[in-house]
Amino acid sequence: MKLDFVNSMVVSLPSSKVLTYGWNFGSMLGMVLGFQILTGTFLAFYYSNDGALAFLSVQYIMYEVNFGWIFRVLHFNGASLFFIFLYLHLFKGLFFMSYRLKKVWVSGIVILLLVMMEAFMGYVLVWAQMSFWASVVITSLLSVIPVWGFAIVTWIWSGFTVSSATLKFFFVLHFLVPWGLLLLVLLHLVFLHETGSTSKLYCHGDYDKVCFYPEYWVKDFLNVVVWFVFIFFSLGYPFLLGDPEMFIESDPMMSPVHIVPEWYFLFAYAILRAIPNKVLGVVSLFASILVLVVFVLVNNYVSVMSKLNKFLVFVFIFVLVVLSWLGQCLVEDPFVFLSMVFSFLYFFVIFLLFLVYYFAGRVFM
């Protein structure tokens, strides 16, 4: 029975005849998730979740633990690798209209939200100047929630400010959430394998598909090349994607001149800063991810609109890249104005993507 289940997942799974490297992203994400859990578990052996010792314990891992620096560098850059493939996987889903598989799409959005929360907590654990103040700013945004906002912030902080108790809370969650992610990923795969993945040829039945093995196995060997590039980058340029403030121990009495999150949060951070009202800014921040759920309302596939869909997806990627650049710029003109413009374009392009297929279903079907 167990062998039949494994066989249905990785051998006889009906797969699209159109073999593209876009299908590597999901398998690569699974590999990186396992890699992050292994390296993170090793780091947890030596990490101290006390506010007075956290930053020093990270330095201890880097300088005193045998090969500790390798694990820390690989885990740090592994988060960036994970988000690169996570966003590529999302873009591929938009490109091939994978949101037609409703349960797969919704479970994927939930995984995205959990991964972003997980990455943020891991960022805070370094307890450096930038990560400490980022935790203060981001968690305090929850205070805009009516009635319960202040109570929620106090509960997360475990007090009236970010402290050692907050660090312990984040450390426990950062250690436990990946195991929940594994279950969600398994559920994501089960939902996917109920129908098979989408195809730009839109193959309707299993009779018009090929087995996962051997073609898709061979295709996945590209992941080996990616791993070699990742290791070379991590060892040659270990902190290129980091911030210099992350090498300074946190000081609650002095904030950095310019608070900037990790690169994979910059687009959402730019949207947050673009809105002058705090409540609307927080709503826009969460909406930037949750708005992707609206695609499950699309119930049709109209091939005459596929070219327009692909064009809009590329426009969406361009807008996302520009927003990420604006997110690390200073809060001054013209960057503030440009953030407003591209924040509007971000939601407008998503609205157009949805609108195209909503009305196409009424006109052509």
Curated annotation (Swiss-Prot):
Binding residue positions for a ubiquinone: H193
Keyword Transmembrane helix: yes
Signal sequence region: none
Alphabetized GO MF terms: metal ion binding; ubiquinol-cytochrome-c reductase activity
Record's keyword terms, sorted: Electron transport, Heme, Iron, Membrane, Metal-binding, Mitochondrion, Mitochondrion inner membrane, Respiratory chain, Transmembrane, Transmembrane helix, Transport, Ubiquinone
Domain of life of the source: Eukaryota
Membrane topology type: Multi-pass membrane protein
Binding-site residues for heme b b566, renumbered to this chain: H89, H188
Cofactor info, note text: Binds 2 heme b groups non-covalently.
Membrane spanning residue stretches: 25-45, 69-91, 104-124, 170-190, 216-235, 279-299, 311-331, 335-355
Subcellular location: Mitochondrion inner membrane
Family annotation (SUPFAM superfamilies): a domain/subunit of cytochrome bc1 complex (Ubiquinol-cytochrome c reductase), Transmembrane di-heme cytochromes
Location, primary (coarse class): mitochondrion
CDD domains per the UniProt record, alphabetical: cytochrome_b_C, Cytochrome_b_N
BP terms from Gene Ontology: mitochondrial electron transport, ubiquinol to cytochrome c
GO cellular component: mitochondrial inner membrane
Cofactor: heme b
Pfam families, sorted: Cytochrom_B_C, Cytochrome_B
InterPro entries xref list: Cyt_b/b6_C, Cyt_b/b6_C_sf, Cyt_b/b6_N, Cytb/b6-like_sf, Cytochrome_b_C_euk/bac, Cytochrome_b_N_euk/bac, Di-haem_cyt_TM
Residues bound to heme b b562: H75, H174
Assembly mode: The main subunits of complex b-c1 are: cytochrome b, cytochrome c1 and the Rieske protein.
Miscellaneous section: Heme 1 (or BL or b562) is low-potential and absorbs at about 562 nm, and heme 2 (or BH or b566) is high-potential and absorbs at about 566 nm.
Function: Component of the ubiquinol-cytochrome c reductase complex (complex III or cytochrome b-c1 complex) that is part of the mitochondrial respiratory chain. The b-c1 complex mediates electron transfer from ubiquinol to cytochrome c. Contributes to the generation of a proton gradient across the mitochondrial membrane that is then used for ATP synthesis.
Family of this protein: Belongs to the cytochrome b family.
Protein's UniProt name: Cytochrome b
Gene name in the database record: MT-CYB
